[in-house]
Amino acid sequence: MSFVSRFLSFALLVTVLISCGCQPPRDPMLDLLDVDLTKTKQDDLNRTMALVDSEIRFEQKEFSNNMATGLNRWAETRGSELDDQSWREDELTKELMEASGSLDIAEGFKDLSFFNTDGYYLQQSNWISQIANRVTDPEIQMAPFELYRMAADNYKPDEDVEAPLVEVVKKLHPEMGDDAGQTVANSMSVFDWVVRNIQLLPDSNLTDGEQEEARLNDSETAAAAGIPGVGYQRYPWQSLLYGQGDYVDRAKIFMLGLRELGIDSVMLATKGENGSLVPWAVGVVVGENYYLFDSKLGLPIPGEKLGSIATLDQVRANPELITSLSLTNEESLADNTDYWVKPEQLDDLVALVYTSPESVSKRMSNLEAALPKELRTDLAFSTSEIAARLPAKEGVAMEPWDVGYQTHEFRQAIRNALEKKSDDVISAKLNDYYFNEFYIDNFVVYRTARARFFKGKFGLDSEGRSLNAIQSFQRLKYTQEQIDNLGSDSDQQRRLGIRKEAEQNVTDFNTEVRSVQGQMNLIRRDAGLFLAQCHFDNGSMNAAANWLKNIKAEDGVDRWNDGITYLLGRSQEKLKDYDQAIEILSSDQLQQSHGNLIRARMLKEIVNGL
């Protein structure tokens, strides 16, 4: 029988079998191929996601390009498998998406392809997840909360107490059960980390004339025009990387950290004179209550019992909880010592649910579902579902918060302007970028050190192949000799990514060296505070205090004076040198002085009552 005859006979047999409802046996090789293909797809995804947590010293642009390329390759190989029919457009963010139509990332939220900025979003989620889970570890969770421990009748936990901070919270809130106590304790831990490690910047409240001077383009909205404003100038990952942010930047990181822990929260906003919304305090959902955390004050809003945290219902019922947040003349001689919110403003609030173009996109929903458990973070979330879980309160409306969209608009304006940096007028308007961001964006080992800190990598590598966070920042405390000798130090050049190309002339090489030397001067100024933060997080309060005292006297650290002073006060508080802590926190020359003085007041009252 010829090959053609045999093939036709086989085809006829298959047809008969199918018509009878029977199927021919599947070739086992096909099963093996399917398994191999599935494994290849997953390996491809794992390799790409490994870049998020990698210590390979990528340039930022190289990192974002590699992430987008890898994710899009994975998305293309998955094809129709990725088309999750259960995904639905988020109803509450439709208007935000339409209003942000000029953004590619908003326009493409229904697509499966990834954008170059998505790598930063994934890295941000990874960093915040590691921070939130690390600081809520019961074994270390209690360490920063000396003030609250003393307020809880000088509580001294027995060795067999598994979650001492939860016990402190329950003592300060006698009506609270274990689950609620755990939620509040975890919220305190994430909030406290953010306040300690993100130095508070002043609000960007520009006059009309200053706004026009700062304008980068003709867009109608301030954010899209590149005009600085409160809360939208930095992505959360940038605030983490730079170690600075305004009170809204702090709140965003706090809320995202809570989300990683499965805790709902909103930004409660008051109404301004022109009807605009003014962010006030983060309301953490615990049962039917909003527990209040003020990121500008740097404190949970105190309740009636010393050391307790107030709820929205409580401050509405007892206006004195708000008015008592104003400072006395003995505490401060500042021109305005009033707390920035009045009790009557609390009758008409808006609960803002934090969202972003990425979090409601189809691509992030599919990616999160495909990630293995050990790599999974909270990438996608429905604003509508969060809103449905919020406690209903009279006089509290609910809206999605547009700040995440405004950030994309602002950063797009900056990116477009940087392409026109040869224009002297535009270049002058970018001074803030060059002064505060450029040197960090281009200094790879700095970013690696920060990432090690976020992960809590404080232990020694037994094989000696990788530095921990403390060692990384110690290495960044460059001596003047190291900076001066960079041009002849080939080892240091290699570590900093300086390579003299064969075709590069001496003048260009020397120009590059001088640029890096300038960056080294700025980096060593920053590294001292970051090193002290590592020691504090690692429970070494003496080491933190010693470092802070030393660097306070260094030249050029004025940029970090707020962070140094606050962390030194907190270190002395933990070391039980309460008088010294009160004195340090009582300085009224800092951006966070108002909240520090309230903390000093609380600490003094607690110590006097022991």
Say what each PLM segment does.
Residues 58-59, 65-242, 287, 447-515:
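Secondary-structure boundary elements
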Residues 514-522, 552-561, 586-607:
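Short solvent-exposed coil/turn linkers within tandem alpha-helical repeat scaffolds
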